[in-house]
Regions:
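Conserved glycine-rich "GG(E/T)P / GGGxP" loop and the immediately following alpha-helix
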Residues: 1-133
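Accessory C-terminal segments flanking Radical SAM cores
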Residues: 137-178
Length: 178
């Protein structure tokens, strides 16, 4: 029913899409039907899913590397190494990869360390862009403000109208079809 109405199918919303065992099949099916598939992930399951994901070859994979900040005691060096091993391989295969640091105005204190870890795998200089850097062909680092899910109970804006701006030109379908 979506054919002819939309171009892009984004496989993300709430939760980690790489947990779904049929994700690569969904990507292939989307491509066969003429859609442009994009995946957004926190990157923690890339190693386990790399071969099937690379074979499915989505148009773009966005990796929210800022998500690692919430994992106290986790190994950032190992995490970034795994993300970069996957990302450089994917980019070489023609998949656009965006490493997202969407934490401005929040927990951005570790960003310089993360950028140093990325530079171990793709040395600088990088090409500056309005939203970050192009660090190699098909491989980008992007910055943006910290995203906070709308919450009517939030004390700062509980009396205001809460609205997700993405709903102006996007819809989301959860795993249960809602």
């Amino acid at each position: 029913r979506l054919k002819g109405r939309i171009k892009f199918l984004y496989f993300h919303l709430m939760g980690e899409p790489l947990l779904h065992p049929l994700l690569p099949a969904f990507v292939l099916s989307a491509k066969e039907k003429g859609f442009i598939p994009v995946i957004t992930t926190n990157g923690t399951l890339l190693t386990e899913n790399a071969a099937r994901l690379l074979d499915a070859k989505p148009h773009k994979i966005q990796i929210s590397i800022h998500s690692h900040e919430g994992n106290e005691g986790a190994d950032p060096d190992g995490y970034i190494a795994r993300v970069m091993n996957f990302s450089t391989d994917a980019a070489e295969r023609g998949i656009i990869v965006v490493l997202r640091l969407w934490n401005q105005g929040g927990y951005e204190r570790n960003n310089e360390r993360i950028l140093q870890l990325i530079a171990r795998h793709v040395p600088r200089p990088w090409t500056e862009r309005y939203d970050g850097w192009k660090i190699s062909p098909n491989l980008y680092v992007e910055f943006d403000k910290m995203f906070e899910w709308p919450d009517e109970g939030h004390e700062e804006y509980a009396q205001e109208e809460v609205f997700c701006y993405a709903l102006r030109n996007q819809i989301g379908v959860l795993a249960d079809g809602t």
